[in-house]
Amino acid sequence: MLPRAVVLLSLTPFFAQAACPDWPVPRATDEITALQQQLQRWDSSYYRDGRSLVADELYDQARQRLLTWRQCFPQAPRAMDQPLLGAGGSIRHPIPHTGVEKLADANAVTGWLKGRDDIWAQPKVDGVAVTLIYHRGQFQQALSRGDGVHGHDWTRAAWQIEAIPKRLPRPVDLLLQGELYLRLEQHVQARSGSLKARNRVAGWMARKQLTAAEAAQIGLFVWDWPQGPATLSERLEQLADLGFAEPREYSRPVGGFADAQQWRARWYRSPLPFASDGIILRQSRRPAAERWQAKAPYWIAAWKYPYAQVLASVRQVDFRIGRTGRITPLLEIEPVTLDDRQIRRVSLGSLQRWRSLDIVPGDQVAISLAGLSIPRLDEVVLRSTLRQSIQPPREADFHFLSCWQPSPGCEEQFLARLTWLSSKQGLNLQNIGSRTWARLVETGRIKGLLDWLTLDQAELANIAGFGDRSSKRLLESLHSARQQPFPRWLKALGIPPSGSADLSGPWQALAMKNSLDWQNEAGIGAERAAQLVAFFRAPEVLALQGALNSAGIEGF
């Protein structure tokens, strides 16, 4: 578990183009203070208790956001930023734990590698850092990382962990730095993420008593031998001889950027026995241990895996009304990139979820991809200090029988009805989508769901964008609807789901059914039956049935 604060050194250029918020100074002061306080809470839990309350990648982005806001508003008061305050334990490390510089992207990695030789790559194991001390080959003490200078005594728990050798093959004095991790089988980071593995180990180590079952799940990855041989290859071989073989298995020489990229991709997508969140690049040779300090050195750097989550600022909250009257909150966000995709909006699914999350413009939220393709909101990371009042559409005003005309407030649901009508689930009208329907509605050519049945060439000729060729193609597609069978027309009009009921018609036969008749059909319960009865009796639907009857559509 390496310190987080050093991320700013390498991420600053990457975010240099971030836009400044349009805030007056008092608002900026409030927002900066709120973000700094949140970071302090995370730091306290991470360094003092060993528990991570937020994903590292979100922490990194939040800390970079703080830096950006401070640069945008230099006149805002600035509090002292001390991430490691209160993190230290009571025991001084014989040799400090260094930090690690985090490289933001491929360009940063290329720059770091330039002019260096004898570089090695290792997985950046996602666990908790520990110092192990041996005297004459006997295990003597284990210390938590703490603030890098002072740590807590973990010796009692360490005696329970089988992965920590208690007696070495040779009577040597030894100080090692490494990672205690949760053992995982065939763990693929790209697929499963970190599974809160670090939190579990940190929680176990913080207890007064570690159970045998918990101890058996903890592994050890030694990533440094400060007073060991001069080169990493020598250190790896001698560590293996002493019983610490895992570092040798997961250390690979890097000849240039292509090698680093290859190992990063392989360890991200291949099975490993632990969670990892990137790769470590380290020079084989480094200064004497007496010169080490608790800060990021020049001889180690981290290249994190692609973001699984990004921090996004909410621009506004919109509400989409669908064909059935369902109201879906949508967050318009400052554009962010995930898996090479730019994301500008994300759905919250339901009004209930939006209300429970209480999201307003200015909130900072975590976004990921569900199934590697669909943007998903994971959590609210930081709430704006200005809580705007947002009034969503009234749920009672929208339902499966509302908005059959584009009257004020009904435009969106009505357009959704038209789009459904021409879709593959409806009449399957070629070359007709929401944009075409919107243009016809905006120009007043369509004021009801079936007005398009009487459209002609002359009417289309007066609409910008409809030339002779496109008008002819549109009319041919609309005319093809007349040959569609009765059941497809019912679905196009928006009949509620009807299970496996026979919808072959005619209309009158279906309209005569009562609730019990519908419930006798497979897959239809009382609630759905009531909706079907209401559909066939609704005045607006009866008007559509009359229009289709007059147009000679079969079944009506």
From Swiss-Prot:
It is an enzyme of class 6 (ligase). GO terms for biological process: DNA repair; DNA replication. The gene is ligB. GO terms for molecular function: DNA ligase (NAD+) activity. Its EC number is 6.5.1.2. Disulfide bonds: none annotated. The keyword DNA-binding does not apply. Gene3D superfamilies: 5' to 3' exonuclease, C-terminal subdomain, DNA ligase/mRNA capping enzyme, Helix hairpin bin, Nucleic acid-binding proteins. It comes from the Bacteria. It catalyses: NAD(+) + (deoxyribonucleotide)n-3'-hydroxyl + 5'-phospho-(deoxyribonucleotide)m = (deoxyribonucleotide)n+m + AMP + beta-nicotinamide D-nucleotide. The keyword NAD applies. PANTHER family: DNA LIGASE, DNA LIGASE B. The active site is at K124. Signal peptide: none annotated. Belongs to the NAD-dependent DNA ligase family. LigB subfamily. SMART domains: LIGANc. It holds the Pfam family DNA_ligase_OB. Keywords: DNA damage, DNA repair, DNA replication, Ligase, NAD. This is DNA ligase B. Catalyzes the formation of phosphodiester linkages between 5'-phosphoryl and 3'-hydroxyl groups in double-stranded DNA using NAD as a coenzyme and as the energy source for the reaction.
